[in-house]
A protein has these predicted regions:
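Conserved beta-strand in the GNAT
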Residues: 54, 58-69, 82, 87
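Non-catalytic, surface beta->alpha helical segment in thiol-disulfide oxidoreductase systems
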Residues: 237-258
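A conserved beta-turn-beta hairpin within the catalytic core of GNAT-like acetyltransferases
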Residues: 71-83, 93
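Conserved active-site alpha-helix within GNAT-family acetyltransferase domains
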Residues: 123-148
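Conserved acetyl-CoA-binding loop-helix of GNAT-fold acetyltransferases
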Residues: 88, 94-110
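C-terminal "cap" of GNAT-fold acetyltransferases
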Residues: 148-173
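Conserved GNAT acetyl-CoA-binding A-motif
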Residues: 109-127
């Protein structure tokens, strides 16, 4: 299916595939090298079952999902679809577009005979780019598991026998055995391409110990010691945040004034 449309709001949605990705924008990265890095990551995932739909109208309105066995997160969710990102922002909010996109994911999951759908969420300031648990609860999702850092794995079962998905132990209790700052990231989120080098430069300029680790392998991502793999920042072994830091925010986090 290349497109689907909803009569209620007259919006059409385009499916991004290996055939059209070079000529289509992908919402979260509309230009420059950020888009190139994200698109390269997507191209490698399409063969693994990744689906990406965006609104025909230009803006931040899209869903990205993949069979859970191929998801770049440390979860056990056999038979599930995992939503990488469901993002509706700015002027796109308030028109029912999220319901359209989630509805298409549910339809697809049923067509594939999947046990259900799962997605990460968090409350309040911890949420950032993760989904709103209140919205997910309204749509029938319930909490399957919770990491020590407060990030939850929510799920929508589609069969009576669906097993509850869960975090792997490494994600349930995120910690590492290294001192200083350690940052794990992937190219799944285009903003890492821009901000990680700038944070690294700022850390070096201020003598702050920072090790950056780009994850480029699914198996490594699926066993990372954090529930979020697109961006996971640790300090002295403890998980700090999955929120992508600007250079200024990172320096403030490190205690640099001014």
């Amino acid at each position: 299916m290349g497109k689907f449309a909803k009569r209620r709001n007259h919006m059409q949605y385009i499916r991004i595939t290996s055939e059209n990705i070079d000529s289509e924008h992908i919402c979260c990265a509309m230009s420059g090298k950020q888009s190139v890095a994200k698109k390269a990551w997507l191209k490698e995932r399409f063969a693994e079952g990744l689906v990406f739909y965006r609104s025909e109208e230009r803006g931040k309105c899209f869903i990205e999902y993949i069979p859970a066995e191929n998801a770049w997160v440390p979860i056990d969710a056999p038979g599930y679809l995992y939503i990488n990102c469901l993002w509706i922002a700015g002027s796109m909010k308030g028109h029912g577009y999220s319901s359209d996109l989630l509805g298409e994911c549910i339809r697809d999951a049923k067509a594939q005979g999947r046990q259900g759908i799962c997605i990460l969420s968090a409350k309040g300031r911890k949420r950032e780019f993760l989904s709103d648990p209140k919205y997910l609860s309204y749509k029938g999702f319930t909490v399957a598991d919770t990491s020590d850092c407060g990030i939850t794995l929510m799920y929508l079962p589609l069969t009576p026998s669906a097993e509850r998905p869960k975090f792997k132990k490494c994600a349930k209790h995120p910690q590492i055995g290294e001192d200083g700052f350690v940052l794990y990231y992937t190219d799944q989120c285009p903003f890492t391409f821009y901000w990680v080098p700038r944070v690294a430069e700022a850390a070096a300029a201020h003598g702050i110990p920072l090790k950056t680790v780009r994850i480029a392998d699914k198996e490594i991502a699926q066993n990372l010691p954090a529930p979020v793999t697109t961006y996971a920042l640790f300090r002295d072994g403890k998980f700090v945040t999955h929120t992508i830091q600007s250079d200024k925010k990172f320096l403030a986090l490190a205690g640099v004034k001014g």
